[in-house]
Amino acid sequence: FAPLVEVPGEQLSVERMGAMSAGIVVSYRRDSAVIVVDLGGGYGGSLYERLKENGIEVRAFKGAEASNRRTDDRKLAFVNKRTEAWWKFREALDPDQPGGSPIALPPNRKLFSDLTSPTFEVVARGIKLEPKEKVVERLGRSTDHGDAVVMSWSEGMNYLTPVVRSKMFNSNKRPVVIRAHERQKAFLHR
């Protein structure tokens, strides 16, 4: 992942938010990367529409939708897409998987905190991720960085462009794993 780009909402006019956001996204987009837009809370719809209208490949992320996937070991289901995305990202970060983790994250304390703060629980329907409101209450801020990374990754390897795929698998650089006891893991690219 490249360093995260953050644009405060107050810099965008409400009337033109979709068009302005699309312009920002396109200006930072590299290697024809697939864009994933959060359609769970209101403001993503106009951004999604502007990108689609211009022929830019974009995927909608709706975290509240039902999930039909299971954990890698096939033992548990997910309560919703949000839980599925966070759990699958967690599985993809596992350095002990064959070949190690293909993910390298930028060194960003806020991102590290966002990715390691939410907890999971097992309920009757499967795995459930802690509600974002509870994480926000505990941290005193939103987990926007972590949400952006997890959502952008949520489409997984199936939607990597050929350019990005060749860079990932033809690079001599591998992620460096930094373990902080049993509590947390961070994956930084050097």
Residue ranges and their predicted role:
Residues 1-127, 170-190:
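Mg2+-dependent endonuclease catalytic cores in nucleic-acid-processing enzymes, primarily RNase H-like
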Residues 105-167:
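Charge-patterned, long linear interaction tracts outside catalytic cores
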